[in-house]
Each structure stands twice: as C-alpha cells, then as structure tokens.
C-alpha cells in the first residue's frame, strides 16, 4: 500500500456481529414510513439553496484497499451549515411550528443539531434556545449564537444539557426540537430522521443504478444511522451490508446490540468524535437498528486527525476534502477492517465491492482541527 505503507497500524477497538440481524424492509418502514420519508424530500428539495451534496469517489483509497469503489457523501456542501444535520433539525422546526411565529423552539446539542435548529428557526423568523454542555467548544457555541440563538451552557455532559433543556422548556412552554426520542417524545425525532433520509435519496440518484454492497454509518444516538437504513428500505432494491461505527468510549449502539436491549453507557472519557459521544441510543432509531445493523465497530480516537489530514491533502481521492472529526470514523473503520484479514473476509470486502461512507460534516471547529492534524 503506497498511502498506508508507513508501518502505521490502523486500529479498531471491537468488531461485533449482530446475532439478531434480520433486514426486514416492511418492519423498518413501520418506524419511519414511506410517506414521511417522501414528505421530507419533497419539502427540503424546495428550500432555497438546496442542492444534492457531492458523492466523491475515493479512487486512490479504493485502489489501496483493493475494492471496486469507495464513495464519500460530502456533507461539507450542505446548505450554509456544512453538515448533514441541516436536513434534520431545520426540517423538524418547520414541521412542528406549522407557520406559528410565536413559538419558541429549544434543543440540547453537541453542536451541529443545534446549528440546524437555530438555522431553521432563523429561516422561519422564530426565537430559539440552545443548551450545550461544558464540553462543547467555544467556536461551536458561537456558531449557533451567530445564527440568532440564545446559547445556554450547562455544567456536565450532553445528557445534563438535555435534562436542563427539558426542564426549562417545560417551565416556559417552549417547543423542544430534539433528535433524541424518549417515552412520549417520538414524533419530532422521527421528523429529524426523515430529514436525514434525504441523503439516501440523493445517493440513489447519484450512483446511476450501481449496486451498493456496503454502507458504513456513524452513530451517536443513532438517528442518522437509523434514517439512512430507513432510506435503504425505501429506495434500494438490494440490501447492502450495514455497519455502524462509534467511539469506543461511547459505543451505546454496539453495547445495545450485544445484549438486545437499550444499554446506557457511563462515558468516562469524551471522544474527539464529539458529535458521536452519546451514552444512550434513541428509541426511534433503536427500533430500526436492533435488527437491521449487521456489524458494529468501535474505534479509539488515535486516527482521527491523520484521517482528516489525508482526506484534505488528496491522498484518498483526486479532490481535497474538508472533513470534520465526525466524518473520519467510516474511513478509519474501513481501512482497519481491510488490514485485518479475518474481518475483511467476514465483511466480504473484495475487488467487486462498492462502499458508501458518510462525510457527515466539515471542520466546524478550525482550531480543533489544526491541533488534531498537527499531532
């Protein structure tokens, strides 16, 4: 391997097969219906500034790993937010407010979901309250404030910020627009996921009837992964091998699939993959993920900065790709899997295979990126 031949070993922490795997399209579409998926695409595709984000061929990496094609869905180009999250929170704001300008929307976020809600609120002329944990960088908080949101920092982690959001929203009669589901709060996260599924519609249009064999999906609370799998059930004729990747410090989907029930992770160390550092899978995506994810992979933070650098200097493709830390895990897990011959064989990765990765965001925190790629 030319690019990867410097003796560096690409690492994964754990690889898990889903013993309960059964990809049932009809069952998946009971969680998010065809109509909900179609409504999201029909609405979002009419928004000002909408355009499908690029599907970039990582031709150099494909050759290195002896795969037919590796594609990278580049969400750096998504509206002004430069993240797939623009599809979810903003669409949910539109759905729940129904043109009522007096509604105040609120959410808790690790960054990009809050930016989407703030952007969606500004787009509709609404007031917006954003709750962030103390671990969210100053740059990410400022990005939401720049969109007109009132940003409230909460001591503790993401879960603490969510609890404070729920408390203050209940006290003040604000409308919570969250991407996390819990008992009696399912509809808004479904709207958010329906928005995310637009990516899968675009991919289907972009691959020109090529058969995708594998798709690697990042998971925090599982919303994007569940949405993309719902999109597969809606739009694809074949069923690709579905792989979820998470930080090893917050592998809540992996642990839940291991036991067959929702498991809460006590996060001892915050991952560099901040938007994925979540301790509990959301209920709506869990109903999809528990049977339709074939394999789970957890990763350490070791290769995040290097992967961002290699994407950015055209090592993996003919294009320079501006990637954030949450865009790197899919590529890392694919390289690490190909370097482990047992895993490569189990995943059936060979010269005929075509793999989708989701480049979920650009470098929304440039100071953090500079530090990462210099290490």
What are these regions (language model features)?
Residues 1-375:
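PLP-dependent amino-acid enzyme catalytic core
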